[in-house]
Amino acid sequence: MKTLEYIDQSLFFFINQTCSTKLLNTLMPFITNQKNWAIPIVALIFILMIKSGKRGRITLGVLIICIGMTDFISAQLIKPWIGRIRPSHEILDQINLLVNKGGKWSFPSNHAANTMALTVVISYFYEKYKPILILLTFLIGISRIYVGVHYPFDIIGGFAVGYIFAWGTITLWVMLKMRELKRGRDWVWYN
């Protein structure tokens, strides 16, 4: 266990301090700030609801259920149960903190869990967007370490939670779709 903690802290300090540049000190807080994603998220919802037909509306429904579950379980159940303290609370005097400290608990990262869930669900329905979504998910995860509010294993744990819940939600969707198609109901079918 001590070896994992050492690896986690070493990676944290490498990303948070060794990789620190003026450009990244401006870019990473921008990437990590949820408010900066409001317009793209509203645009995504609009596109899925209005412009993408039935497939888009189904994607949006699966996405809302998935992220709702992922966010709740990660923030309300796993974080308090694990009880890992953020680097911004634990070692504040040793880090390059570029945003506010955030809540007390760090594992798993909700940013990482939610963006991974979004990536998996949208990639399932629209595979052509997978590369850009993976890149954005990775950037958001790295930004959380860079700004000083998460350890690398918090991000990896968040990615795992998001991935598991996304595939669980997709699996339930596929089961529902197959059941409805067997019953002759075509509301689940899209092109």
Predicted regions and their residues:
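Interfacial segments of alpha-helical transmembrane regions
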Residues: V42-I73
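Hydrophobic, aromatic-rich transmembrane alpha-helices
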Residues: P40-K51, T115-S123
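Membrane-helix interface segments
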Residues: L23, K54-T59, Y126-I132
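N-terminal transmembrane-helix/juxtamembrane module of multi-pass inner/ER membrane proteins
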Residues: M1-I39, S74-G102, G184-N191
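Helix-loop junctions at the membrane-solvent interface of multi-pass transporters
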Residues: K51, W81, W173-L176
